[in-house]
Amino acid sequence: MKLLVDTCTFLWLAAADPQLTDTARSACRSPENTVYLSALSAWEIAIKHRLGRLPLPETPARYVSSRREWLRLEPLAFDEPSAAHDVLLPPLHSDPFDRGLVAQAIVNGLTIVTPDEAISAYPARVLW
């Protein structure tokens, strides 16, 4: 299975947070699955850190890169087809990062790993 972790899921995986469900944790750790982290999540983390809403033990760039590698996640660029698909989505979610992740999941045939119930309203596969 090809999975796309949202920002919250990535942070919880990196911190071994107990809020992460067993289903999500198992799917993300399974060697049978390819798990992606979007550049959108890296950008969201950097913005939240700069605004003082997300304390990190190191720079956002170093944190995201080192945790992504440690968790064996593949990087996923936010490309032109995903950007074009984003504007076709109904305005069901106010967070532009989450809308971008939905677009990426649809365009790339990925399942989104997220606790965000609002994402389930979109025509994307969700795992939690």
Regions found by a protein language model. Name each.
Residues 9, 41-42, 82, 101, ...:
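Alpha-helix capping/helix-boundary segments
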Residues 1-37, 51-66, 108, 117-121:
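Short, well-structured N-terminal submotif of metal-dependent ribonuclease cores
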Residues 71, 122-123:
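Short, structured coil segments at secondary-structure junctions
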Residues 55-61, 65, 69-115:
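Active-site neighborhoods of divalent-metal-dependent phosphate/nucleic-acid chemistry enzymes
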Residues 7-8, 45, 86, 105:
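Generic structural signal for small/hydrophobic residues in well-ordered secondary structure
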